[in-house]
Amino acid sequence: MKNEIHPDYHPVVFQDAGTGFQFLTRSTATSDRTIAWEDGNEYPLIVVDVTSESHPFWTGAQRVMDTAGRVEKFERRFGGMARRKKKA
């Protein structure tokens, strides 16, 4: 293996923004925020939108994730095209 070409792989805490669920894993991701973990050490904290605690596949619950109104925006821009009939 070559030296100095691999990214820094270190322990990181990920936190679910919706549920507050946290887990410690290893990652190349970095953050200025830190958190004291159960073992007494400080680790970088990365807040994410979805984890296994809140993802519909794992929870069995459906949740709308359309934060930007993308479907409505698409309908406004292109919705009329499907309704128009082509003239022969």
Curated annotation (Swiss-Prot):
NCBIfam families: L31, PRK01678.1. Belongs to the bacterial ribosomal protein bL31 family. Type B subfamily. It comes from the Bacteria. InterPro entries: Ribosomal_bL28/bL31-like_sf, Ribosomal_bL31, Ribosomal_bL31_B, Ribosomal_bL31_sf. The keyword Transmembrane helix does not apply. This is Large ribosomal subunit protein bL31B. One of its GO terms (biological process) is translation. Part of the 50S ribosomal subunit. Keywords: Ribonucleoprotein, Ribosomal protein. GO terms for molecular function: structural constituent of ribosome. GO terms for cellular component: ribonucleoprotein complex; ribosome.
